[in-house]
Every structure is written in C-alpha cells, then in structure tokens.
Amino acid sequence: MSVPQPRLTLSDQPSQVRHVVIISEDGMRPDLIYGQQNMVWHEQLYRNGSFSWKARTIRTASTLPSHASMLSGVDVDQHGLTWNTWLKTRGFIRVPTIFQAAEENGLKTAAFVGKPKLRHIMPAGTVGIFARPGYYCKKVSDEAARYIEREKPELLFVHFSDPDEAGHSDGWMTASYRKAALASDACLGTIYRALQQANMIDETLVIVSADHGGHARGHTGAIPSDREIPWIASGPGVRRGYHIRSAVSTMDTAATALAALGLAPLTRISGRPVSEIFQSSTRTGL
C-alpha cells in the first residue's frame, strides 16, 4: 500500500478552484500554437492565463511514457511504462496517479482519450470513467463535453490525437499538421464551452499541454523540438498573460493539479507545483 505524502503546496493556491481539467494535445509543438493564426481558443487561454513555450517532457518523448509522467508526477524509471503501444500482458503503471488521489478523497474523476494504450496508465478501479469515444478529437471532445455538463467532475483528463497522427503521416509543421492543430483548437473550444454551459468555468483550473513535439515524421527525443511542449494554465486566481519564468516539466502537471485541488500525492513524486502562475492576492496559507 502506498504511504500518503504531505500535501504539495501552492503558496498562492486559489481557494476558488473546485475542478481541474487537463487537456493533452498529442504531439503539439508550442511554436505551432503561438506561430499560427486562428488558434483562437489557445490564444484566449494563454492571453487570459499563464504559459510556457519551453516546458519539457521526459527523455522518453513518446505518448505512453510521457502521459504516464504527466499524470503520475514521476519519471519513467519509477512508473515503469517504457513501451508505447497497448500490450495488456505488460500490465499497468506501477505508481499511483492523480486520479487515485482524487478518488480516495471522494472526488469525481474521468478520462476521455483517443488512444487505447493510455489504459495502461488508468486501469479499471483507478479512475471513475475511462472512455475512448473515437480516435479523433471531435468525437472525444463531444463526448467529454456531454459528460462535463451532466456530471461536473472535479478532475478530468481529455486527450486529443490529431496533431500526432498528422505529424507521423505527413510530417511535423506541414500543412496537414497545421490543419490537425486547428482541429485540436476547435476541440479545445468544445471543452471550454461545456465548462461555461455547466457553470464550472469560474471554479476550474484548465491546463493545456502535450506529451511531446516532433520533427520530420517522428519524435525520438534527441532534439529540442521533440521534447519541448506547451504548458498553458487558465482559471481562477491565475495570472493573466503571464509568461512563466521557471522551468516546467510535464511531471509538474500532476503536482499542480493535486495542489490546486488541495490533495496529497499517494507516493513521493518528482513534479512540483508551478506556483508562480497564481496571483499573490489569492494566498490561502497552504
């Protein structure tokens, strides 16, 4: 059994946060977000929130290991997911995730994903709902939006596959990749509108990030464009239009989500809350 750890603290953590939504855009490069027109929902979030274009994923810059680190707060040597495909015989993540911490505190959790291999991170019994409505983000976001409006979860993870699929098919930063990024932007809007419709937006910390970037038709992790990822946070108490100064790791996503909800990790983690995103006026003493 995991030994509960002390609560991670955000010195400026806002008491208004009641929900956290993490949206991962598979293979999304940060320079695509700030360097392309019509990324309207991304722009709305980073102009009204805090952001880093130099956040980093783990050295194993691929979907399954990276998402495991994003949602557990530890590196691959601890979580054990070294492969990158659905292999039921290999088993599941060997450390607790943020969903288990939330579930143990009576919070409602859910995950809507485009790739079945992410089940290795969230086996049955560790997350309230695990759903794969389809591969592309339109089906994923539509189903997640309906769930948001109906259930109002405290912790939600949504995964979009579109940028990664286009990158592998035609190349990162190609016309088709840019088109896929625009589709992902529209799906981000679907989630945001659902939060508004459910009257959750004023109590929700939204974190938008990615598992890895890419170049040519792959992402080995050997160069910056593979490991650099966007990291955007928007919500109550978050600094507006603020460029994060400190280094941000994908493992910090887990830590920030837990701290924002006032939860302790179920085991020791490497990630740390990105506390500078919060305004000093919302200090709660955590």
Language-model region placement:
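Metal-dependent active-site segment of extracytoplasmic phospho-/sulfohydrolases and closely related
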Residues: V21-I22, W41, A183-P224, W231, ...
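Active-site His/acidic residue clusters
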Residues: P116-V127, A145-A186, T190
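Polar, surface-exposed loop/tail segments
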Residues: L263-L286
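Substrate-binding rim/cap in mid-to-C-terminal beta-strand-loop elements of soluble/periplasmic
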Residues: L71, A222-A264, S275
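Structural recognition of the beta-strand scaffold that forms the well-ordered cores
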Residues: V20-S24, D31, S52-K54, S69-L71, ...
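Short, structured active-site-proximal loop/turn typified by the sulfatase FGly-forming signature C/S-X-P-X-R
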Residues: D31-S66
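Catalytic-site neighborhoods of secreted/periplasmic enzymes
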Residues: D77-V140
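Solvent-exposed loop/turn segments at secondary-structure junctions
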Residues: D26-P30, F51-S52, I58-S62, D75-D77, ...
